[in-house]
Amino acid sequence: MSEKIYMAYNKIQDYLNSYFAKHKIEASMFDAIHYLYNQRDFSYKSTELNWPEEKCSNLDDLYQVLKNIAIEVTPIIRNSTANRLIKNVSEHSFFNKRQDANILLQFQHDKNQLHKHDYFEINLVLKGMLIATLNEEKRMLKKGDFLIISPNTIHQINVGSDSIVVCITIRKSTFDKAFFSLIQNDDPISNFFKYN
C-alpha cells in the first residue's frame, strides 16, 4: 500500500454518531476509520478545502466547509489495528512534508484515549463544550474558550454532543519560528512555550 488514503470527516463522524445511537457507547475514531476502510469508503485523492466565494459569515457556513475536509488516514491504516490505539503520535506521521499546520474538527462521540504528540494543538470551542484531561486534571471549556496543548502533554479531548470544536495542529518548528520573538522574553507565557 504505497498510495495515501483519505476519508471525509463527515463519513467518520456519521459512523461515530450511528454507533453511539445504536449501542449507547462511544466507538473510537480508529474503529470508524477501519470500518470505512473495510467497506472501501475512502479515496486515494485528497480534496482541497473548498472555501465558498463569499466569506463564511456564520458558524453554520464554517462548519459546512470544515466537515467536508478529507483526512489522510494512511498512518492509522498502516500502523494500527482497530484494537490498538496510538498513544504517541509523531508529527512525521500526522503532517505531510509540505504542511506546517492542519485545521480540522474534533469528533463528537469519539472514544478518545489519553495520548500525546510532538506538535502543538489548539482547540477552539465554537459551539457547545469539551472536556479536556491534561496530565490527569479535567477542565471543561465552553463556547469561546480555547486551549493550547504543548508538545508531549498527555491529554484527552471529549467533545459534547452537537458541539463544534475546531482543532488547529501546528508543527513545533513552525510554532517556534512564528513565535520566536515572543519566546525570547522572560515571563510566564514565554517560559511555557520555551519549556513545554
Placement of each model-derived feature along the sequence:
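Short linear sequence motifs
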Residues: 8, 12, 44, 85-88, ...
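Helical anchoring/docking segments at protein termini
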Residues: 1, 91-92, 130, 157
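N-terminal leader/propeptide segments of preproteins
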Residues: 1-33
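Generic detector of bulky aromatic hydrophobic side chains
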Residues: 18, 92-93, 107
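N-terminal regulatory/effector-sensing and dimerization cores
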Residues: 98-189
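A structured, charge-rich N-terminal accessory region that forms the first stable segment of a protein
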Residues: 26-80
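A hydrophobic/aromatic-rich effector-binding and dimerization subdomain
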Residues: 5-6, 56-94, 98, 160-196
